[in-house]
């Protein structure tokens, strides 16, 4: 354990698939790197993770300090100053001694054990924070990607609306449609413009949040990889409940408090001090040696209430551990259910998108041939937009579910995503 602590202290400081591919083709200025790279960078540079690392280093320093021996004490006593001389001889005596206190009854070992367990608890809390942060960062990355996808979808929808407006005007000019159709097409263009502006704003906000979470010096303008289309593998074998970072952290904190009980039980044991020194006499050049033993007497304070308080803290920590175990089990079962549901929703949304795309294609052909009214074409286009947005939402929901499952299993979400 000493080597672990010492080494730690030295640690340095769309249309279809096109929607998912277009963000990669945007400007490379301030682009978010692929998620695995961003995750590793953020774990080292994000302010929240820097704070956790500092807490672990502090706990490691405390554990190393707990191994220190008590310091010796030097005493100087000057006696008979100003006393009358006896037969012309000075009565002065100077005593110089050094006292080394010793911790008996295993007090030092108990203190060291507390330091090591507090260090282990700090490491467990850091791992818990890293796992939670990875899940949150994955969701933020996927949210930014989804917002960019919606922005591209809105831009494409605006282009379709303008094409429909041009077609409507041509039909109106040729006398095949009433001027009302042109006004309806203009209204559709205006709605598409508003939707594009809203989607652009949402994408900017999502990228800004991703930048802030990762500790980036400037806001990102795009993402360079896709989590929405990542085929993350769901572990077949259920992870042991003890692997949950929340359970490990709660258990480590319980163990640290349990070690503190031993410290409190031994606190009343006296520290014995052994003294040795020399005494010089004023009336002669001779010196004498002095030795002594000092110890406190635990007459009034035997730390009974301190022991009781430490025991109750352990009981409270055990109750928290039991609660965390139950919550961790529920969280994992819920995450597994969410992943299964998200997969079904994504499959259904993908089928719906394909059907909506085919319906729009046929409606466009029918409108241009004069067989389909404009209002029906507009309705079909809205259905296509809704279907594609639903696919984006389903992909984002799957990322959320996979991130929650990784957190429940104690894994860094999408650490090895491809």
From Swiss-Prot:
UniProt keywords, alphabetically: Cobalt, Nickel, Plasmid, Signal, Transport
Stated induction or repression of this protein's expression: By nickel.
Signal peptide boundaries: 1-29
A molecular function (GO) term: efflux transmembrane transporter activity
Alphabetized Pfam families for the sequence: OEP (PF02321)
Gene3D superfamilies, sorted: Outer membrane efflux proteins (OEP)
Protein family per UniProt: Belongs to the outer membrane factor (OMF) (TC 1.B.17) family.
Function: The products of the genes cnrA, cnrB, and cnrC are likely to form a membrane-bound protein complex catalyzing an energy-dependent efflux of Ni(2+) and Co(2+). The mechanism of action of the CnrCBA complex may be that of a proton/cation antiporter.
This protein's name: Nickel and cobalt resistance protein CnrC
